[in-house]
Amino acid sequence: MQLEVKINLILHATENEKKVFEELEINFQIEQSEFQVEEVSGHFYNPILLISSKLKRKTAQNFVSLFFSKMKKEEFEEIFNYVEDYVTSSGLSLRISKQKLMSGILALSREDTIKINISTPVYVKNETKKIYQELMRK
């Protein structure tokens, strides 16, 4: 199955870059070298880091397996049962709490998030739910 995972997050000057990369490696086995880091200036010229990664093939499959295995059962079931609500034109779009991940907890969130986009080709639109549910079970 063709699979791609995009991970995006924003780090502010007050956040510990080293700790964030450590937690990403511990929780998802993604090394710092697999991320691109771009430094930009914030509204008040404070440094902001835009961090992103694009995982493909085996690395993407490993991430997806780890990601869903670490998710709370209730949140997994919510996404699984209503997967169409989380699918955009670019794939399965999820946001997890950056702060909770620093404590080793994977939790969905709407604020201060790590954006996760999991995409795989869907050739027949009415199979979207089935394809993404199969992906979540692996």
Map each language-model feature to its residues.
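Short glycine-/aliphatic-rich beta-strand segments at the starts of folded cytosolic domains
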Residues: V5-L9, L49-I51, T88-L92, I114-I118
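Beta-strand elements of well-folded, non-transmembrane domains
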Residues: L9-A13, F28, L55-T59, K98-K100, ...
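Long, hydrophobic N-terminal alpha-helical segment
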Residues: M1-E34
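Short amphipathic alpha-helices in soluble, non-transmembrane regions
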Residues: F21-E23, V64-M71, Y132-Q133
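Glycine-rich, aromatic-bearing surface loops/beta-hairpins
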Residues: S93-K138
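Short, conserved charged micro-motifs
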Residues: N16-K19, K58-L66, K125-K129
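Short, charge-patterned binding micro-sites
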Residues: F35-T59
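Mid-chain, well-packed structural core segment of small domains
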Residues: L66-Q99
